[in-house]
Structure formats: C-alpha cells, structure tokens
Amino acid sequence: MELNKTSESLFSAKIDHNHPRTEAHEPRDQREVRVFSLEGRSSTRQEKADRMPGRTSSRQESSKGSEEGAVHESTAGVSSKEEEESKGDGFFTGGNPTSGMALVETPMAVVSEAMVETSTMTVSQVDLQWVEQLVTSTVESLLVADIDGKQLVEIVLDNSNTVPAAFCGANLTLVQTGEEISVSFSNFVDQAQLTEATQLVQQNPKQLVSLVESLKARQLNLTELVVGNVAVSLPTIEKIETPLHMIAATIRHHDQEGDQEGEGRQDQHQGQHQEKKVEEAHI
C-alpha cells in the first residue's frame, strides 16, 4: 500500500509539472511610438510586435485600426491644404481679378480728395489780391534774370495814379548780389522828367532813410541809388550796438572760424587719403 501511495504521488507530481502554466495578465503599454529610418519608412512599436511570433490577433486588429486612422488624418490634412490653396488662387486669378484692387482704390480716392480740400482751404485763407492790385496798378512789364550770379529785376512803371508823374514810364532796375542791392531809375521820357525825378528824390531825405531802414530789416544793404545819370547820396545810419548784438556777432565769428577749421581738416584728410591711394597704386 505504501508503495502504491508513493507511486501515485510521484505520478501526480509528474502530471503537475507537465501541465503548462497559464500566462499571467501583465500590463501592456498601449502608447504608439513611431521610428523613422533614413530611407523614409516609418514603423510603430505595435507593428514590430505584431511581426513577432506568438502575438494575438487582437493586437494586429488594433494596429491596423491605428494605421487606417493615421492615413485618414493625413489625407484629410492634404485635402484641406489643397482647398486653401485653390481658394487663394481663385481670389487673385478668378473671375474678377480686380476685386482685390477695389478695396485699395476706395480709401486712396478719399485721401486724395481730403488732400485737395485741405490745400484749397490753405490757399483760400491767404489773400493775395493786394499783390495783384499792386502789380497791375504800378507795373507795365516785369523782367527777372540772373546775370553773372547777380539777380536782376527790371520793372517798367505804369502811368497811373499810384505812381508819381515824374516816374511814369521809367524803368526801375533792382540788382541784388548777396546782401547788397542797388536801385536805379532810367529811360525817362525827356530831360525835364529826369530833372523832376532827381529833385523829387533829393528833396525827400526822410523817404530815403525809411527806404534804407526797410531794406536793412530784410537783411539787405542799399549800396547805390541812381536816377538817370545822377547818383544820389545815401544817408548813413549808425548801427546801435547792444550786448545782444555783440553776443550775436561773437557767435557768428566763432561759427565762421569753426567752419574754416573744419574745411581745413577735411582738405587735409582728403589729401592724406589721396596720398595713401597713390602709395597703394605704386605697391
């Protein structure tokens, strides 16, 4: 009996060892990892696992489903990009190619109209009628020229109530050179008119003073006044020097010296630069 028990126990032990062990349900990583090769092919960890033997059919079905989803997403993205490109091309090359330009032309027209309106308003605010009246009432003809760097203006005075009878029909010539200006009356009708004009100028020294002062206010110095062939003596106006005038003169003097020094340095620098170029050319 004891032998039978031991044999049965040994037999049962062999049977237990021969039974295959059931596989335990281990946790699985469901994350998808793609591996890209240099040849442009991509594969997932699930696809590699499916190629290995001993895998279940459920894993294969899940991998196929994921591949189909990825392909569907890629095709959808490509189709959406093509639709956007077709829409963009259609806007510029479609049935109405000038539809985009209309949006730009409308505000530009408004801006141009506004500019025209503002310019007309600024011009209308300045009253230039007095200039027209002065020219038409005193000037018969006008000549403006530039001769040898001198600005020349020649006016033929008209016969009107605003011009004295002694100067009607005479020529008034203004020649400006820098800050100096000369005035001459010529081309009188006869000698009597010339004599009358000369006496009229010489007998009114106050008007000569006001003429010189008004020209100085415009940074012009009257150097000569000639009536016919007679040079009229000009009044001398003393310059009133104030501390402000002295300061301004000092500043102008320093500015002139600085400009001269700057020009000298620039000339020296240019000379050195040219010498270097000559040396480089010789080398």
Curated annotation (Swiss-Prot):
- List all Polar residues biased stretches: 1-10
Q: Where are the transmembrane segments?
A: none
Positions of the UniProt region annotated as Disordered: 1-99, 255-283
Record-linked InterPro entries: DUF5421
Q: Which Pfam families match?
A: DUF5421
Specify the superkingdom: Bacteria
Q: Give start-end positions of Basic and acidic residues composition bias.
A: 14-34, 42-53, 61-71
Q: Which family does it belong to?
A: Belongs to the chlamydial CPn_0705/CT_671/TC_0042 family.
What name does this protein carry?
Uncharacterized protein CT_671
The organism is Chlamydia trachomatis serovar D (strain ATCC VR-885 / DSM 19411 / UW-3/Cx)
Q: What is the lineage of its organism?
A: Bacteria, Pseudomonadati, Chlamydiota, Chlamydiia, Chlamydiales
